[in-house]
Amino acid sequence: PLTRDLSQKDGRPDFNIGTDSFHTPNYLIEISKEFFKEKGYSLGIDLPYSGSIVPLNHYKKTKNVWSIMLEINRALYLIEPGNQKSNNYIKTKQTITEYLKILKTAFEDL
């Protein structure tokens, strides 16, 4: 963890999704769990980071405004210390792109 990180715990998951009890339906959480498990990655749910971003004019008011926040463990795509891309950068980018497509499909199928 970086010094500025709120959570200094080791053993972070590969990916983390931040959720909101009002704006993140269980459906999105289950899709996320299944996707990352199938890909062989670990997934934290609100661990080590929690919450998601919702426009204030909809926050806790508009139930059909959904929100999920994706955090990616730097160890997957960076050589540390520093900010050089690792050999896994492209693979990580492709995984994220595929995940976003899965989420988009989930919205379209409703």
Functional labels for PLM-detected ranges:
Residues 1-78:
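Catalytic cores of processing enzymes, dominated by hydrolases/peptidases
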Residues 80-110:
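His/Asp/Glu-rich mid-to-C-terminal helical/loop segments that flank catalytic regions of hydrolases
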